[in-house]
Amino acid sequence: MTAQLQSESTSKIVLVTGGAGYIGSHTVVELIENGYDCVVADNLSNSTYDSVARLEVLTKHHIPFYEVDLCDRKGLEKVFKEYKIDSVIHFAGLKAVGESTQIPLRYYHNNILGTVVLLELMQQYNVSKFVFSSSATVYGDATRFPNMIPIPEECPLGPTNPYGHTKYAIENILNDLYNSDKKSWKFAILRYFNPIGAHPSGLIGEDPLGIPNNLLPYMAQVAVGRREKLYIFGDDYDSRDGTPIRDYIHVVDLAKGHIAALQYLEAYNENEGLCREWNLGSGKGSTVFEVYHAFCKASGIDLPYKVTGRRAGDVLNLTAKPDRAKRELKWQTELQVEDSCKDLWKWTTENPFGYQLRGVEARFSAEDMRYDARFVTIGAGTRFQATFANLGASIVDLKVNGQSVVLGYENEEGYLNPDSAYIGATIGRYANRISKGKFSLCNKDYQLTVNNGVNANHSSIGSFHRKRFLGPIIQNPSKDVFTAEYMLIDNEKDTEFPGDLLVTIQYTVNVAQKSLEMVYKGKLTAGEATPINLTNHSYFNLNKPYGDTIEGTEIMVRSKKSVDVDKNMIPTGNIVDREIATFNSTKPTVLGPKNPQFDCCFVVDENAKPSQINTLNNELTLIVKAFHPDSNITLEVLSTEPTYQFYTGDFLSAGYEARQGFAIEPGRYIDAINQENWKDCVTLKNGETYGSKIVYRFS
């Protein structure tokens, strides 16, 4: 991934420290939308990698991530060695005012030393542009001075807590460093006030660990029942309603302010340095009660609250004077407190526990502990759990009542085996065989690498099973239900197929119903048309604890009707009957140690003339039932697709023996791209959406 980002991108690379956090993650979105590439470094002490995984899907970009403490010079230097960093936006640091008064040494060590190490590495690797996330806390109590509300940048500084002192110290370090070399360093110091809200997508937001320190996150937790009531500290101030006045700024506006500052540094005189401060705020103060009522309106809930005494150190009014930013950075806020409350409520309702979901576990799947090489388990500790991988968006494991029922590997190495048999993987762009690897589309002929006899199978060298998907976005929309969304950007230059294709896979795990639903979608982002046929290639063994074989498995299918194929496994144009039990049969077909053998494409309706590129609105049809009497586990496979390949695993490899698992692969017809009767259902044109659904249901 490192080499890929370096070689493929001509964009400037911005190192975002603390980029997994609240403000950092929103700034990464804005950076990518403005054409930058990002590398994120974060020690995850007050954040989680899940925000970065969501950012990848939200921005449709791979975001290299390093779990590193800035005080770890050797660990941080890896970033500068592996990427040509153009600039740095520095968010990383401890940030709780109250906590800083209890553990001041930790704040001084982490915030100041971490920044010094970062600046030393920037100097060593000739990186001169630096945007610093400072804070309005450097002003202290600005009300002690006449005519300093709203607060201008010229207001004398006087922080009143260790957190503020660390920000003040770092500002002084930046000024000293600039004065030592006024031709090279370009520093933007951004002092901002009260960030609130969340991204309007609802995918990222503030997720404080422990009790929230700020007003809006606390109210949100009261609204969803995580806290009993809101506490308002004082209603006897000389304000409109007796509560203090603060300058609240939507986090998206704040993120855009960082882009404006970075672009200002980039446009500044090439032969001159700079160290300058800007306030980022709305310039409009809102009282605590005004924000309270705005959030109650957005949520439709009258939150319980209690007025208590003033907190020590609280003052009447802390509002920014943002004129300098408006004049020089050409930046100003666009969103209101009401917008912030609406976006925060969307984030809260869709993610009531933030990124912290019970029943979700993740572990590294590769020795180098890469975050884009993880196995994520959903439903951990329940009677039905599913484990997925970024590589191939693969199903690594399914456990029913604690018993594994699919084949898989303990680590990523098994899936990277050249002879992996596609175990558990998403198959695409085109599942199954294409005759001689040839097809024609839009008056152009294409040749795929032949990899299966005389044919191309499962997309040949462009198969998705070796490609690393972005994400996942994991959510828990309701009790017992989890979703995991993966995304792949499959560009024409990385495959033998035409067009740039965006693919999303949403897995829905219902632990109560013991079901796994897969929804596949695909859209062309460039190009006229492409062949497409997506499926999953899991191998099932319903009796794994008792035997490494599918022997004894009882099978019934919807229909005996199957696509007739020639000696090269390519359709002849006929539909034939296979010797296999259907749902109407009195007895199932029982799989033995060697026979019967199947590698057949069964059809759901022999009279159908499929033309749909999107089958998501079709009826979800039961196509296969499998049962093993020793384990007493039943598998039902349902699909919206017109066919399903049933394969008894007679040529399994890569650490597995023949008939250790069987595969059910719902999808489109074999070689449909070369069959006029079926070609429409596998030809995705620009502007269309490919769609299909598969469900595995256990009992």
UniProtKB/Swiss-Prot annotation:
Associated pathway: Carbohydrate metabolism; galactose metabolism; Carbohydrate metabolism; hexose metabolism
Mention one GO biological process in which this protein takes part, according to its record.
monosaccharide metabolic process
- The residues that hold NAD(+) are 13-44
- Alphabetized UniProt keyword annotations: Carbohydrate metabolism, Galactose metabolism, Isomerase, Multifunctional enzyme, NAD, Phosphoprotein
Location of the active site: 537 (for mutarotase activity)
Q: Tell me, what is one Gene Ontology molecular-function annotation carried by this entry?
A: UDP-glucose 4-epimerase activity
Record PANTHER family: UDP-GLUCOSE 4-EPIMERASE (PTHR43725:SF47)
- Name the UniProt record assigns to this protein: Bifunctional protein GAL10
Query: Which species is this record about?
Result: Saccharomyces cerevisiae (strain ATCC 204508 / S288c)
Q: What is this protein's gene name? A: GAL10
